[in-house]
Amino acid sequence: MEGKEEDVRLGANRYSERQPIGTAAQGAGDDKDYKEPPPAPLFEPGELKSWSFYRAGIAEFVATFLFLYITILTVMGVSKSSSKCATVGIQGIAWSFGGMIFALVYCTAGISGGHINPAVTFGLFLARKLSLTRAIFYIVMQCLGAICGAGVVKGFQQGLYMGNGGGANVVASGYTKGDGLGAEIVGTFILVYTVFSATDAKRNARDSHVPILAPLPIGFAVFLVHLATIPITGTGINPARSLGAAIIYNKDHAWNDHWIFWVGPFVGAALAAIYHQVIIRAIPFKSRS
């Protein structure tokens, strides 16, 4: 028995550096096993000569194309039915958006980071997680993918597409532009904050399961935001999604409030980046110490 007790003592001493739970994780030993990655350069000319740079852009294009194709088709399926009980309803639409984000982030995270959203790209750029060159390239490819995805849906079901709003985001009757803007800001804040938390490099360094599970909370956040804001704006929180549907549908009312679906998500993404980097992680203060 004495030998076994000694083994237990040795084991406890050997693994005493394991990560504490809760606020204890904020102790003085934080820097022993983790070093903050350097910020991405604003411009990185070498990227333009790398195939991985263009491969990542293509991945963003294809992912956003598939995202718009599945989600807009789902919206059309609900819109054409006179009885919402006979279709998947709002919950089904929310699941299609959240489920596709879950699947596509899982598929593309190792190639491009799995942004699939200019607001996510913008937030990560503000946090210096990627260069301006890559951010602009991603946003362009995301918008092109969204336009093509919505265009294919219209090609399959033109009458249904044009007769049921084309999945374009508009502020619903009974709500003001301020309501719509606020819903888009808060909804995008939730999404981008979840992205920062789920992909946090410090957590990844300490918990090996975090990178594998990251797509799940991101997709679930998209699902929940859609449940809450579909009745208000149809839920944008993704400027590429809103732009693609608006361009292909191309009716006046789809453009009247279109600015909301760019300003709202970008403001929400900026707030999420500031909150996570400055308040939660205190990155600026660490760099001075």
Curated annotation (Swiss-Prot):
Where does this chain carry the motif NPA 1? 117-119
The membrane topology of this protein is: Multi-pass membrane protein
Which organs or tissues contain this protein? Expressed in roots, leaves and anthers.
Subcellular location, in the record's words? Answer: Cell membrane
For the motif NPA 2, give the residue ranges. 238-240
Checking CDD domains in the record gives: MIP
Cite the Pfam families for this sequence. Answer: MIP
Q: Which SUPFAM superfamilies does this entry report, sorted A to Z? A: Aquaporin-like
Which BP terms in the Gene Ontology apply to this protein? Answer: response to water deprivation
**Protein's name in the database:** Aquaporin PIP1-1
The species this protein belongs to is Oryza sativa subsp. japonica (Rice)
Alphabetically ordered keywords of this record: Cell membrane, Membrane, Repeat, Transmembrane, Transmembrane helix, Transport
> What is the UniProt domain comment for this protein?
Aquaporins contain two tandem repeats each containing three membrane-spanning domains and a pore-forming loop with the signature motif Asn-Pro-Ala (NPA).
What family is it from?
Belongs to the MIP/aquaporin (TC 1.A.8) family. PIP (TC 1.A.8.11) subfamily.
Induction field: Down-regulated by osmotic stress, chilling, drought and treatment with gibberellin and abscisic acid (ABA). Increased expression in the recovery (post-stress) phase of gibberellin and abscisic acid treatment or drought.
List the transmembrane segments: 58-78, 93-115, 136-156, 178-198, 212-232, 260-280
Positions of the region Disordered? Answer: 1-36
Query: Which PANTHER family does the entry link to?
Result: AQUAPORIN OR AQUAGLYCEROPORIN RELATED
In its UniProt record, a GO molecular function of this protein is:
water channel activity
Cellular compartments per GO CC: plasma membrane
| The protein's role, per its UniProt record | May function as water channel to facilitate the transport of water across cell membrane.
Additional observations: Recovery of PIP1.1 expression after chilling is increased by pretreatment with mannitol.
